Amino acid sequence: MFLIKVKTIKFQNSTILIKNFFKILFFLFIISCSSNDYNTEFPNQNNDEEDENEFAEIDYGLTEYGITYQGIDRDFSIYIPESYTHDSPSAMMFVFHGFGGSNDMIMYYSDFNSISERENFIVVYPQGSSFWGYPHWNVGGWTNTSSADDIGFVDFLIELISQEYNLNQNRIYATGMSNG
């Protein structure tokens, strides 16, 4: 849990501050109620009889994963639209949250899941590392105290997801908010 510093500002009507405070508390309550259950491996990873031409059984909808990359526990979610098949290569979109955000938050307010259903592409929501107590992406510059190799993490995810789903390697895209 983290604390939110509330700066007191004198208003003629203090109900504005109180309403915003309760909105923030409600939002934090909703986030804290979310489940942390996630898969630690893809369905086909432990298959002793792997066939290089055979993809995993399709798990439509949203699936959350947790992995360790370069000694750091990392999370990501994948959304597979109902229209996806292994028969034709699919585009993939990475959606990056901003500084202090989360993959769950950007998924909810970006609405890429419904867009992927309409346009038939896979969506990946990676979670940034949290070296200062706030999730963020190591983009150099002002985040230079972060030692996370986020470019390597994304490359690793592309490789990992390509093993399970038929991706068009020429149609891998990224979007994000702020630090994402």
Model regions: which residues?
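N-terminal secretory signal peptides that target proteins for export/translocation
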Residues: 1-18
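A domain-start/cap signature at the N-terminus of enzymes
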Residues: 33-92, 118, 151, 171, ...
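Alpha-helical and His/Cys-centered functional microenvironments
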Residues: 16, 49, 101
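Sec-dependent signal peptide recognition
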Residues: 19-27
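Short intrinsically disordered, low-complexity coil segments enriched in acidic
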Residues: 1-2, 159, 176, 180
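Serine-hydrolase catalytic machinery in alpha/beta-hydrolase-like enzymes
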Residues: 69-77, 87-173
